[in-house]
Amino acid sequence: MQNQRIRIRLKAFDHRLIDQSTAEIVDTAKRTGAQVHGPIPLPTRKEHFTILISPHVNKDARDQYVIRTHKRLVDIVKPTEKTVDALMRLELAAGVDVQISLG
C-alpha cells in the first residue's frame, strides 16, 4: 500500500454537505498517518432551466431554475492499512456521491 495513491471524487448539490464530508475524509486520513493533498475544489456545473408558467399564452411569464453540482477532489498519498480500514467504515452524508479510484 505504500506506493499507491487513493483518489476520492465527491459530488453534491449542497456545498455544505460536500465540505463537511471532505473534512471528515481528510481528518480520518491524517489521523491514520497518511499524507493528504486537497481538498481541491473542481469547477461547479450549473444547469439552467427555463419553464413557461402560463398554460396557453403569456410567453413572457417564465420561471428560471438553476441546479449546481459541486465537486471536490482529495488525494491520499502513501495510505496505510489503517487508512483504508478507517475510510471503509466512514459514514458520509446521504446527499454526497463518492467515487474512489486506486492509482
Swiss-Prot record:
Keywords: Ribonucleoprotein, Ribosomal protein. Gene3D superfamilies: Ribosomal protein S10 domain. Belongs to the universal ribosomal protein uS10 family. Involved in the binding of tRNA to the ribosomes. It comes from Baumannia cicadellinicola subsp. Homalodisca coagulata. GO terms for cellular component: ribonucleoprotein complex; ribosome. GO terms for molecular function: structural constituent of ribosome; tRNA binding. It comes from the Bacteria. InterPro entries: Ribosomal_uS10, Ribosomal_uS10_CS, Ribosomal_uS10_dom, Ribosomal_uS10_dom_sf. GO terms for biological process: translation. It holds the Pfam family Ribosomal_S10. This is Small ribosomal subunit protein uS10.
